């Protein structure tokens, strides 16, 4: 599904990512690790099509509409409710039965009681859980998750553990995390950036 050959990214004279090469088959799970500033976020943005490589070749064999991206920004509308946000994204992605799918995800991630609350009133952890719902709403073939456990309490992190275990082998997943032990058992490949 993904082939990267000597992929680099520069911003002006700053090299944000240096000569990364890897392959990931459909259904695989790539765990990207490395210290702050090593290029993890840059690589995930490249995979999501939000940036283009300066050098090298990057091939992602997935339709853009079949990609789910969770970055550092939640990409949610603060003035809309949780349910309205998911219904909006459901329309954009043409999700059949979007209200039912949104309700199921809100229930799964412990947000059903807050479904009619404006996102601007949410805690950081609630916002992260809703962003995960948004990312999973259209059942993407490729999930690109940048620090998905960020701001999650233990209960929500355990929910995400279960979700990732359920997706293992059925979806292609690329994720970065400061807690690699959480997902090491699911990873079919590991990429350590320096």
Residue ranges and their predicted role:
Residues 154-156:
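Helix N-cap at the start of a conserved alpha-helix in ABC-type nucleotide-binding domains
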Residues 2, 17-19:
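Conserved structural motif at the start of ABC-family nucleotide-binding domains
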Residues 143-147:
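Catalytic Walker B motif of ABC-type/P-loop ATPase nucleotide-binding domains
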Residues 87, 97-114:
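Conserved ABC ATPase "signature" region
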Residues 33-35:
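The feature captures the beta-strand-to-loop junction immediately N-terminal to the Walker
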Residues 48:
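Helix-to-loop junction immediately C-terminal to a conserved catalytic motif
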């Amino acid at each position: 599904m993904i082939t990267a050959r000597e992929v680099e990214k520069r911003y002006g004279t700053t090299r944000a990512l240096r000569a990364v090469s890897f392959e990931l088959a459909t259904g695989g799970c790539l765990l990207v690790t490395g210290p702050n500033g090593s290029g993890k976020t840059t690589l995930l943005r490249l995979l999501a099509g939000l940036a283009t490589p300066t050098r090298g070749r990057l091939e992602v064999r997935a339709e853009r509409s079949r990609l789910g991206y969770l970055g550092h920004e939640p990409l949610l509308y603060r003035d809309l409710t949780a349910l309205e946000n998911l219904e909006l994204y459901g329309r954009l992605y043409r999700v059949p039965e979007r209200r039912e799918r949104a309700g199921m995800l809100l229930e799964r991630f412990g947000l059903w009681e807050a479904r009619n609350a404006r996102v601007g009133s949410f805690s950081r952890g609630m916002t992260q859980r809703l962003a995960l719902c948004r990312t999973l709403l259209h059942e993407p073939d490729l999930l690109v998750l940048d620090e998905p456990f960020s701001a999650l309490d233990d209960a929500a992190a355990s929910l995400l553990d279960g979700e990732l275990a359920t997706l293992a082998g059925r979806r292609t997943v690329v994720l970065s995390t400061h807690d690699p032990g959480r997902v090491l058992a699911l990873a079919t490949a590991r990429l350590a950036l320096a």
